């Protein structure tokens, strides 16, 4: 993964102690990194995907002299390995804000693709069409990711996260999976067949479900950045919001239990074989009551385990409700729990059609089932094309038609997304990064940035360190940096 500079924070030390509200409370930083797939159809001769990606990023290179840059909304935009355009959202305090920033990434990628498409047609014919897929597996079977980031308190050991959180992450795919049509049938997740380890610091030699590489992008003595790899890329706004929201509540319960030396209620949920459990969950529709083996020797279904997590979190909320309510600026705990309860009830009843307006895999299953009823002779290749259209944010029509017919719920309006394209969250350090990047671009200054540093490289070198991701107020170093810029 390309870096503008070394963004590790192990060598940095906070000049002031971390505020107790951040360490003792439940506030959190959320972020989503999405890798996109790129393809071209209708060209008069073959076009390499790498060439397409570079054409998309030509305006970025012209402006920033790099394919790796930060934007005025505080996000990061870059080309990942394998010519996959990637967008990493600015730091957000609330799942709803993180969703807005993620949708802003779709908007940015779509605009880059359509501009590149016009240029490509000059050389490859009037029908050359660029497709940008927000999914996780291409037609050749190569997998790429959607990674969630959660700031967690460092006093929680990684072993605790592995044993208590991973079973939740695996089974939450019942309502956050994007679904995938395979030659062997329909799976509710996209990446289960590609993830081979539970936790690891590697991302290329192996494919872990949770990455343990220690890059907190915050005070390293107080926080770690939990880098979740197991999740799918979602088109559904509800699914993106939901996976962040419910994971936050489970993390709060784990952190508080360890903080006070009491049980979280999740201690006995570790899987004997997480990879095997993940593959079983992905094939949920083959046998919704399939049992997963825990380390204790007990067996439980995926839905049964989600019920247990729900009950434990509900009990936790009864004693910590006020503190939890203050942790999220825009999302209520009652809303999260209500949505969680309703989706589990629908899964229990097998009412998958009732989930098609919010759960990606359910929406796609309904589409495939309807197609097979109308055309019993439909081929796998045709269904695969339908699925790709669902995930195509540049020229796809299927997902947009579902939204237009009110068959897919939207949590945010187009105006919300347009605002997030141009503006960072106002209550994290992204506000400062966005302000600096916007000003530097406006005056044509030479600068560099990463998650914790802002640097003016010419005409004079100045740097500001933003170690606290919760802090949106300008530091003295930031004010001096802006003075030098102006």
Curated annotation (Swiss-Prot):
Q: Which species is this record about?
A: Bifidobacterium longum (strain NCC 2705)
Q: Entry's Pfam families?
A: Pup_ligase (PF03136)
Which UniProt keyword terms apply here? ATP-binding, Ligase, Magnesium, Metal-binding, Nucleotide-binding, Ubl conjugation pathway
Sum up the protein's function in the record's words: Catalyzes the covalent attachment of the prokaryotic ubiquitin-like protein modifier Pup to the proteasomal substrate proteins, thereby targeting them for proteasomal degradation. This tagging system is termed pupylation. The ligation reaction involves the side-chain carboxylate of the C-terminal glutamate of Pup and the side-chain amino group of a substrate lysine.
Similarity field: Belongs to the Pup ligase/Pup deamidase family. Pup-conjugating enzyme subfamily.
Q: Record-annotated residues binding Mg(2+)?
A: 33, 78, 86
Fill in the misc note: The reaction mechanism probably proceeds via the activation of Pup by phosphorylation of its C-terminal glutamate, which is then subject to nucleophilic attack by the substrate lysine, resulting in an isopeptide bond and the release of phosphate as a good leaving group.
Q: What is this protein called?
A: Pup--protein ligase
Q: Which residues bind ATP?
A: 76, 89, 451
Instruction: Specify whether Metal-binding is a keyword of the entry.
Output: yes
Give a GO molecular function annotation for the protein.
Answer: magnesium ion binding
Q: InterPro entries from the xrefs?
A: Pup_ligase, Pup_ligase/deamidase
Q: What is the primary gene name for this protein?
A: pafA
């Amino acid at each position: 993964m390309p870096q503008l500079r070394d963004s590790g924070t192990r060598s940095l030390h906070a000049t002031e102690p971390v505020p107790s509200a951040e360490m003792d409370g439940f506030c959190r930083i959320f972020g989503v990194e999405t890798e996109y797939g790129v393809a071209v159809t209708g060209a008069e001769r073959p076009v390499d995907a790498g060439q397409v990606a570079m054409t998309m990023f030509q305006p970025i290179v012209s402006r920033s002299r790099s394919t790796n840059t930060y934007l005025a909304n505080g996000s990061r935009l870059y080309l990942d390995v394998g010519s996959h355009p990637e967008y990493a959202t600015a730091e957000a305090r609330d799942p709803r804000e993180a969703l807005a920033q993620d949708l802003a990434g779709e908007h940015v990628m779509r605009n880059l693709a359509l501009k590149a498409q016009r240029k490509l047609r000059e050389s490859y014919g009037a029908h050359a069409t660029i497709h940008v897929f927000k999914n996780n597996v291409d037609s050749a079977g190569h997998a790429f990711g959607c990674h969630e980031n959660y700031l967690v308190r460092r006093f929680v050991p990684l072993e605790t996260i592995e044993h208590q959180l991973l079973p939740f992450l695996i089974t939450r795919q019942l309502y956050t999976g994007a679904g995938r049509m395979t030659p062997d049938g329909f799976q509710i997740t996209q990446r289960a067949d590609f993830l081979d380890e539970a936790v690891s610091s590697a991302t290329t030699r192996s494919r872990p479900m949770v990455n343990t590489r220690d890059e907190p992008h915050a005070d390293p003595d107080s926080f770690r950045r939990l880098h979740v790899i197991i999740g799918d890329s979602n088109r559904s706004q509800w699914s993106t919001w939901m996976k962040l929201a419910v994971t936050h509540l489970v993390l709060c319960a784990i952190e508080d239990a360890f903080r006070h030396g009491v049980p979280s209620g999740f201690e006995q949920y570790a899987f004997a074989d997480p990879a095997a459990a993940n593959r079983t969950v992905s094939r949920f529709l083959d046998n919704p009551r399939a049992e997963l083996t825990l380390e204790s020797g007990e067996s439980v279904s995926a839905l049964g385990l989600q019920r247990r997590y729900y009950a434990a979190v509900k009990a936790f909320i009864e004693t910590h409700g006020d503190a939890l309510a203050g942790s999220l600026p825009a999302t209520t705990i009652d809303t999260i729990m209500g949505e969680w309860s309703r989706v589990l009830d629908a899964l229990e009843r097998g009412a998958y059609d009732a989930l098609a307006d919010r759960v990606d895999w359910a929406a796609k299953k309904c589409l495939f089932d309807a197609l097979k009823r109308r055309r019993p002779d439909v081929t796998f290749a045709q269904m695969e094309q339908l699925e790709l259209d669902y995930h195509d944010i540049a020229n796809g029509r299927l997902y947009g038609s579902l939204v237009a017919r009110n068959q897919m719920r939207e949590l945010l309006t187009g105006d919300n997304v347009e605002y997030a394209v141009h503006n960072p969250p106002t209550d994290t350090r992204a506000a400062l990064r966005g302000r600096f990047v916007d000003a530097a671009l406006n005056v044509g200054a030479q600068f560099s940035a990463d998650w914790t540093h802002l640097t003016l490289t010419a005409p004079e070198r100045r740097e500001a360190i933003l170690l606290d991701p919760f802090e949106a107020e300008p530091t003295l170093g930031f004010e001096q940096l802006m003075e030098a810029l102006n």
